[in-house]
């Protein structure tokens, strides 16, 4: 547990976990990061260094009631299963880049990664930066990138997201982008946002299998290796069993 800390003016991540729980057995990490003030991070390495990074394929971690602010790239990154992110405040993030988000997750071609919750957070003053006189593009408060599936995003407040379309349209700037399927987005409040919600079919949808279930269109998953070797893959009903 990391709680009640003030973390600031660090060269890379404010908090980084290399391993969070057991991905194959779904044994939770029980990591809790709470009540921290994290700001002015990524002072030396400016991209993909965040206030909180739960690491790759994390299981059962919690980020609660933290204030993450004043960062050049993402405020928080997570991947995995059964993570809970609530009561946090995110602001003045992604100040030096485009195509990044305050809270970024990438389930990518892992559609059995379910049970993640993002709720009761406050996102504000994001996507308003000008880089060498050019407006940002493709910046969101929350993004489930590359076909992220099965996330629950609810009861969050989004305020002052974007520059009011002063660039080219909304510049791809807004509150939520959910690029996959089976994402539940409800009871959120959007105030003064360029755009509230966007879903894209830019990435190939999960394909139907012969037995009426679904499977991802990647070599690793078509072979059944990942699905067969994770409890979550075995128990998710809409995925093909190899």
Which sequence ranges carry the predicted segments?
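Asp-box/WD-like beta-propeller blade repeats and closely related beta-sheet repeat scaffolds
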Residues: 20-21
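Right-handed parallel beta-helix
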Residues: 1-12, 26-42, 59-72, 81-95, ...
